């Protein structure tokens, strides 16, 4: 997608949900996982486990003494998702500034389209104890591959002495996360929410509960996501169960609830990205939804009636995480770049372009009152983005309030393939009609 397309969308000529939003690409990669019945064949995990033995080949890798021996090589290879960094005329202003100030060249690769296929791509190199070609990779916490990389010892523990900006500016949602206690292996890149949305023209008294998805008053007008991980998680929330600490017996209870929802005729369909269009068209009144789609839809006066709920049971938050794969050739350069993105000045530029949940709360003030190199960068981006800086700074979907932060929930972290199989065997049949 070009920057011009982005600008046209802002002007109202193109549906704003089509341009880069908070969560749009998140769905495509989740769908790739879901359609595959959990995303990973058992052989991928088992082969990896046999090759690695779930331990580092060199136990000293990632220790303070190991890090002290590492040197800057003035190059870093960074693998990320497409359309996920500030871009102007084909270049990233933040990456250019990093190179200018540190003399570290960044080779930036947009090679990750979904977690599963990318994991399958780098797994053979890791199993063979070889460099993957990347010093930084970005993986999502609610998909199995990140857990596999951690469990198999295929990520280098971070050098916390080089996390100055992170320690000072990282927000509470990304510090000490459930999927990586102490941020041993990861630093968040960006985050997003999965929640419930409704059309306020048809739904007059929505309340503040995910139970709206199970209200018979809206039978045939309710949309659910066709991602088994999202579907199962909202079922658990509806039962008052914390997804992150849930058990297989509780998964079964959630599946029964969701099957009843379907059998009772409440569900119009199980949607991929198309759910947002059905909300806009008015044939679906209530739906599971990604925060970014609603944010983008609200940019058009035509869709101001679409509302994202903040349910009392909580919002599911996914996070894309920067991490350093084992055998990386430029780990110190990688650490330098990762911490650079935790400067509020830098993050304000990224966030103005991305509009995701920002990992650095201080970037809000830098958007409202730029004080550094970001002033020129933001000014350069503004004609392409077509929105005031305050549109990003004042959005609770980018800079959540304390209430939203308290209601944020994390996904269950699968420990092995058997757990993935157990989950998908319960929730995929609901989606697929079995």
Predicted segments — roles?
Residues 1-27:
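N-terminal secretory signal peptides
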Residues 56-144:
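Early extracytoplasmic/lumenal segment of secretory-pathway proteins
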Residues 195-202, 236-241, 318-333, 349-352:
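A bilobed periplasmic-binding-protein/Venus flytrap-type ligand-binding module shared by bacterial periplasmic
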Residues 146, 221-227, 231-235, 243-309:
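Ligand-binding pocket segment of bilobal, Venus flytrap-like solute-binding proteins
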Residues 325-403:
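Mature extracytoplasmic/periplasmic domains
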Residues 21-31, 41-65:
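N-terminal twin-arginine translocation
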Residues 67, 130-138, 156-195, 221:
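A structural signal for short loop-to-beta-strand junctions that line the ligand-binding cleft
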């Amino acid at each position: 997608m070009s920057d011009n397309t982005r600008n046209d969308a802002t002007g109202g000529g193109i549906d704003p949900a089509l341009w880069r939003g908070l969560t749009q690409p998140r769905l495509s990669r989740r769908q790739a996982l879901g359609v595959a019945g959990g995303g990973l064949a058992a052989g991928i995990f088992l082969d990896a486990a046999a090759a690695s033995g779930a331990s580092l080949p060199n136990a000293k890798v990632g220790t303070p003494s190991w890090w002290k021996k590492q040197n800057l090589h003035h190059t870093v290879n960074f693998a990320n998702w497409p359309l996920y960094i500030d871009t102007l005329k084909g270049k990233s202003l933040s990456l250019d500034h990093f190179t200018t100030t540190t003399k570290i060249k960044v080779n930036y690769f947009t090679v990750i389209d979904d977690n599963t296929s990318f994991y399958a791509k780098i797994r053979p190199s890791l199993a063979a104890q070889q460099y993957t070609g990347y010093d930084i990779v970005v993986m999502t916490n609610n998909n199995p591959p990140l857990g596999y990389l951690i469990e198999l010892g295929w990520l280098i523990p971070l050098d916390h002495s080089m996390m100055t900006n992170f320690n000072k500016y990282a927000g509470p949602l990304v510090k000490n996360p459930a999927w990586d206690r102490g941020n041993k292996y990861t630093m968040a890149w960006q985050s997003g929410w999965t929640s419930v949305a409704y059309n306020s023209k048809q739904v007059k008294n929505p309340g503040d509960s995910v139970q709206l998805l199970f209200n018979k008053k809206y039978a045939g007008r309710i949309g659910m996501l066709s991602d088994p991980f999202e579907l199962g998680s909202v079922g658990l929330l509806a039962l008052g169960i914390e997804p992150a600490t849930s058990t297989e017996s509780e998964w079964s209870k959630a599946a029964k609830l969701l099957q009843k929802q379907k059998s009772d005729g409440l569900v119009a369909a199980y949607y991929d990205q198309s759910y947002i269009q059905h909300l806009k068209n008015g044939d679906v009144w209530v739906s599971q939804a990604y925060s970014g789609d609603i944010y983008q839809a609200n940019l058009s006066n035509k869709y101001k009636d679409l509302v994202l709920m903040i349910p009392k049971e909580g919002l599911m938050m996914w996070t894309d995480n920067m991490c350093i794969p084992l055998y990386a050739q430029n780990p110190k350069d990688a650490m330098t770049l990762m911490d650079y993105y935790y400067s509020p000045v830098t993050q304000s530029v990224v966030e103005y372009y991305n509009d995701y949940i920002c990992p650095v709360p201080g970037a809000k003030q830098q958007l409202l009152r730029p004080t550094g190199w970001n002033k020129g960068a933001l000014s350069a981006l503004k004609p392409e983005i077509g929105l005031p800086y305050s549109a990003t700074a004042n959005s609770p979907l980018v800079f959540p309030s304390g209430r939203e932060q308290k209601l944020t929930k994390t996904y269950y972290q699968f420990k092995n393939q058997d757990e993935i199989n157990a989950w998908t065997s319960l929730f995929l049949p609901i989606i697929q009609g079995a």
